[in-house]
Each structure stands twice: as structure tokens, then as C-alpha cells.
Design a protein with these regions (language model features):
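Non-catalytic, surface beta->alpha helical segment in thiol-disulfide oxidoreductase systems
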Residues: 79-98
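Short alpha-helical
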Residues: 33, 56-59, 85
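Thioredoxin-like thiol-disulfide oxidoreductase module
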Residues: 53-72, 96-97
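Local sequence-structure signature of Cys/Sec-based thiol-disulfide redox active-site neighborhoods
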Residues: 11-50
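N-terminal targeting signals for export/organelle localization
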Residues: 1-8
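Structural micro-motif
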Residues: 68-78, 87-88
């Protein structure tokens, strides 16, 4: 399911909705088109977000990897402190919303 978390141990699915009141964090990098696209998509929907720059910061890359169970590519998106996914999941989420 797009835009959701799956907890294998409990076999439950939690749907994450992005609203204008959501706390959204985007791990991003300079000069990387997928990051720019994710940020533009959120902005076009009126969603404020904190951009966490991983370029030149091993500390931020490690932080992101810890929060995403090892993912080290960007963008990585969190909504209300829950892992949402990357650009592909964000695009799919908004396609389902239309």
C-alpha cells in the first residue's frame, strides 16, 4: 500500500496522510533532481516541510539510514515522525488523492 507502514510482526497497516498540519521532513541533497521534484510536489500542495541536507554531512546520512532501516539514497520523507518513503511513494500518494 502506498504511503503506509507495514509492521510484519503485527500484520497491521497504518496509513499515513499528509496534511497542511503534518510535520514533514525531507532528507535531500544538492543538485539531485528527485529531491527537487519531491520538494516542488510538496510545495505545490501547500505542504510546509523541513529540508534536511545530507550533502557533505556523513552525520545526516547516518541519521537518515538509522531512521529508514538502512536507506542511504534521497529523497527520504517522514510525516509526523513516521517513515513515508521516497519520491516514488510521494508521487503515488498524490495520484491516489486525485
Amino acid at each position: 500500500m502506498v504511503g503506509s507502514l507495514f509492521a510484519a510482526e503485527t500484520q497491521t497497516v497504518e496509513i499515513i496522510n499528509i496534511t497542511q498540519n503534518s510535520k514533514v521532513e525531507v532528507y535531500t541533497a544538492l543538485f539531485w533532481a528527485p529531491c527537487k521534484e519531491a520538494k516542488l510536489l510538496l510545495q505545490s500542495r501547500g505542504i510546509d516541510f523541513d529540508a534536511i541536507m545530507v550533502t557533505f554531512s556523513r552525520k545526516k546520512v547516518n541519521e537518515m539510514a538509522k531512521r529508514t532501516d538502512g536507506k542511504t539514497f534521497v529523497p527520504q520523507i517522514f510525516v509526523d515522525d513516521q517513515y513515508f518513503g521516497g519520491l516514488k511513494e510521494l508521487i503515488s500518494y498524490y495520484k491516489e488523492k486525485n
